[in-house]
Amino acid sequence: MDPLIAPLAFLLAIALGCAVGSFLNVVAYRLPEGLSLVHPPSRCPHCGHRLGPKENVPVVGWLWLRGKCRWCQTAISPRYPLVEAATGFLFALTCWRFGWQWQTFGYWILISFLISLTLIDWDTMTLPNSLTKPGLVLGLLFHLLLGWQRGHWIVPLVEAIASAVLGLWLFDLIRMGGSLLLGREGMGDGDPKLASMVGAWLGWPSLLLTTFIACFIGSIYGGLKLLLGTLQRRQGFPFGPFLAIGALISLFWGEKLITSYLNFVTPQF
């Protein structure tokens, strides 16, 4: 990319990501409640005042309001601008990692699904089918288009389907094993579907890496919560956010991590 154009391209990616992040905040709040995603327009969750154009600008609107509703002065959660900024950062990181090609737009879709599912799971301990199923289908379609571009569409599609099935079966086994060990539901039924979606998008090697990272980070989180006394031994916590973190790490650095691991465990002669 031309050095003069690159900064503008990254700024465009950040701006687009922040705008998408603003919509993802709406999805995370309204979808679990069964509300429309487009009507009514954004408003203060406390007093119901409709936000104006300036107040709706991602990140900047929250800063301009100093984190409070202009009418009722109730504090507005900083999560809103943080989600917007994080989405903008991830969109720019995708451009930096993969360049400006059509696959980048596909990965933006994956990132959007992962963020919205993370927020919903964190809030409600659920991963709605209305997001995991379309995310799975779009992942398969992504690999269908990728294969068509390369002249052999059937192979990437079959690999994506196999990876999706592996994700579903793997996490169903983990779920059943956890239930046997704990004597209760060890994992929600949405986690296998999210794993299936990740497999469809990233393939089985990255799915396995995602699983390892998610279990590792999730174990640390759960252990710390137990030590601090903020989590009971038989109390569950959302696992979807850790799957999403693992998927993002696999998306950006999975190939290098897998190669480094194979070089480490493979004998050198």
Swiss-Prot record:
Its cofactor is Zn(2+). InterPro entries: Peptidase_A24A_bac, Prepilin_IV_endopep_pep, Prepilin_pept_A24_N, Prepilin_peptidase/N-MTase. It catalyses: Typically cleaves a -Gly-|-Phe- bond to release an N-terminal, basic peptide of 5-8 residues from type IV prepilin, and then N-methylates the new N-terminal amino group, the methyl donor being S-adenosyl-L-methionine. GO terms for cellular component: plasma membrane. The chain crosses the membrane at residues 4-24, 100-120, 127-147, 154-174, 197-217, 238-258. The keyword tRNA processing does not apply. Plays a role in type II pseudopili formation by proteolytically removing the leader sequence from substrate proteins and subsequently monomethylating the alpha-amino group of the newly exposed N-terminal phenylalanine. Substrates include proteins required for biogenesis of the type II general secretory apparatus. PANTHER family: PREPILIN LEADER PEPTIDASE_N-METHYLTRANSFERASE-RELATED, TYPE 4 PREPILIN-LIKE PROTEINS LEADER PEPTIDE-PROCESSING ENZYME. This is Prepilin leader peptidase/N-methyltransferase. It comes from Synechocystis sp. (strain ATCC 27184 / PCC 6803 / Kazusa).
